[in-house]
Amino acid sequence: MLDKLQPLRGMKDLLPDDYKVHDYIINKARDVGVLYGYKQMSTPILEYTKVFNRSMGESSDIISKEIYSFLDKSNESVALRPEFTAGIIRSFISNNLRHKLPLKFFSTGPIFRYDRPQAGRQRQFHQLNYEYIGAKGAMTDAETLKLAVDILKALEIEQDTTLELNSLGCSESRSVYQQKLVEYLNDFKNQLSEESRVRLIKNPMRILDSKNEIDQKIVAAAPILSEYYTDESKEYFEDLIKYLNILGVKYRINPRLVRGLDYYCHTAFEFTTLKLGTQSTILAGGRYDGLAKIMGNNDDMPAIGFAAGIERIALMREYNVSLLSLVVVLPIGKNNICYALEIVDKLRTKNIATIIEPTGKIAKRMQRVLNENAKFIIFIGDEEQANNNLKLKDLETQEEYILDFAKTLELLKKY
């Protein structure tokens, strides 16, 4: 006997009920993005591994631990995308879109990371992604944050989230701060977790968001980045706060919130929740002016973006998404099937969602109808066929009607 085949660990099938909720979330988010001038685009799920190595750095957790990369049949190293931003900036460069700036892109689709599966964290998951390329100044950061708030409001979860905000300052601010941070952490080198000792050499700012309890106690007394802002960085953050206040965006400044990659600057943010346990981040992003140059552009390119996990959003609340009011046509006998097919086809051409249940005992067919959560059922027997009528039953009210096709269509169009 063959083994029962299962999906790979950490990868789940999206069944119709799941897809219904995913589609609802995507459509709501897309509609809000359109109001802000975002246009949908997509990049390949598979990219050259160097696209992500170059953008994220080989020492990052994603590249060193989580990326799905392998050699293809041409002996090229390729990878399933672990995030959207790198592929979108690669597309911006390879399609020579510089002359079309500014650009606002919305993307959605599957993301892959070899992570430890748990509730709210899978190895294949889906994201909403927004990138604003050519976004200059603190005002565009504030607008991006307001977009994120409006998306969460449209999805009816904004009230259960907190916007945590920080500024990473300019490169000069970070350089001075990183030196002071390393000096402080070196005194605790032997007490740090093994992972943080590695980060101390390769990416010390990442220690600030360590989940290790001992690391957290050490970090609690570490220098704070804002103490080393240049005048430019300080003014930028003050402008951002001013614009957010004007827009009515509520926030909590978190001086320990960082982005561990060199191309990030100024604004960094996360929307967190208490409803999902350890997987508390729903949406996160930041400004990444240095990424385009790292990936081959001639100069830095001002840009800001964020991503949100669809599966995590779906866990935040119960989405009772109703489909189109489904109509089921049930021919009573075999000699009624041809007429029933004509009716089904005519209803579909009028944009009425319709299925046909042509065979089997009436009781079993009725049970299948109920399982489909249909709104209406149309019975077609010899009498209805002879008189060119339809027997329509409203399954919610239990009301029945004998109508011709035109009257039936008129009634169905109301739902």
UniProtKB/Swiss-Prot annotation:
Gene Ontology biological-process annotations: histidyl-tRNA aminoacylation
Listed InterPro entries: aa-tRNA-synth_II (IPR006195), aa-tRNA-synth_II/BPL/LPL (IPR045864), Anticodon-bd (IPR004154), Anticodon-bd_dom_sf (IPR036621), His-tRNA-ligase (IPR015807), HisRS-like_core (IPR041715), HisRS/HisZ (IPR004516), HisRS_anticodon (IPR033656)
Locations listed in the record: Cytoplasm
Cellular component, GO, one term: cytoplasm
A Gene Ontology molecular function term of the record: ATP binding
The keyword rRNA-binding is annotated on this UniProt entry: no
Top-level taxon in the UniProt lineage: Bacteria
Cystine pairings recorded for this chain: none
Enzyme Commission number(s) from the entry: 6.1.1.21
Keywords in alphabetical order: Aminoacyl-tRNA synthetase, ATP-binding, Cytoplasm, Ligase, Nucleotide-binding, Protein biosynthesis
Top-level EC class as recorded in UniProt: ligase
Quaternary context: Homodimer.
Similarity annotation: Belongs to the class-II aminoacyl-tRNA synthetase family.
Protein name: Histidine--tRNA ligase
Source organism per UniProt: Rickettsia canadensis (strain McKiel)
